Curated annotation (Swiss-Prot):
Molecular function in Gene Ontology: DNA-binding transcription factor activity; RNA polymerase II cis-regulatory region sequence-specific DNA binding; zinc ion binding
Protein name: Probable transcription factor Ken
Provenance organism: Drosophila yakuba
Cysteines joined through disulfide linkages: none
Any one GO biological process: female analia development
Swiss-Prot/TrEMBL keywords: DNA-binding, Metal-binding, Nucleus, Repeat, Transcription, Transcription regulation, Zinc, Zinc-finger
Function: Probable transcription factor, which is required for terminalia development.
SUPFAM superfamilies in UniProt: beta-beta-alpha zinc fingers (SSF57667)
DNA-binding among keywords: yes
Residue ranges of coiled coil: none
Length: 205
């Protein structure tokens, strides 16, 4: 090439001193020799190390940014799943709150006890007020609950509601308000609760 030609001309010229020719020839041989290591100046080595250290220090930040971008891309791949799960969780939470409020929405103003049905609260309030709306028409007994009155009729006044069926020894249970008879106490209780429910209340005495 041209550089080699110029170097040959410079070496063959008469203007160079023998020492200068020897130095140029040694440099040319070193440049073309594959086994000779390349020597870098200290300023170039320091600059190269500084650039390498800066690149290595920036590597963790780059990796963290790449990981965050991959997380975002994964979420964007399934937007309907993410929104669906969020809406599902919100719906479940709202449903549980609604269920809890519907189960315990009646509170006693005296003790704070809660009930799921209004009639349960109404029955409970009689514990505080002392109200006894159910009365026995065969005596002066009064009760807070209708079940207690029916139990009273079938136990205290059992001889009144129990009759003997002719020659048979089987007992039949007659209604104290009408002439109907029943084969069991349970049937009589259902009859009293249905047909004569108003007659069991004290306000109708």
């Amino acid at each position: 090439n041209m550089l080699a030609h110029l170097e040959d001309g410079a070496l063959n010229g008469d203007t160079l001193t023998p020492d200068r020719k020897h130095l140029l020839e040694a440099q040319r041989n070193r440049a073309h020799s594959p086994e000779m290591p390349m020597h870098l100046g200290p300023q170039f080595v320091y600059q190269w190390q500084s650039n390498q250290n800066a690149a290595m220090s920036a590597m963790p930040n780059l990796q963290s940014r790449l990981s965050s971008l991959s997380h975002i891309s994964l979420n964007l791949d399934h937007p309907e799943g993410r929104s669906g799960s969020a809406s599902g969780s919100a719906a479940n939470l709202a449903g549980s709150n609604t269920h809890a409020s519907s189960v315990r929405e009646y509170r006693c103003e005296y003790c704070g006890k809660q009930f799921g049905m209004s009639w349960n609260l109404k029955t409970h309030l009689r514990v505080h007020t002392g109200e006894k709306p159910f009365a026995c028409r065969l005596c002066v007994a009064m009760f807070k609950q209708k079940a207690h009155l029916l139990k009273h009729l079938c136990s205290v006044h059992r001889n009144v509601i129990t009759t003997t069926n002719g020659a048979d020894t089987e007992n039949r249970y007659s209604c104290c308000f009408c002439s109907m008879c029943f084969e069991s106490v349970q049937e009589l209780v259902r009859h009293l609760s249905g047909h004569h429910n108003n007659l069991l209340l004290t306000k109708n005495l």
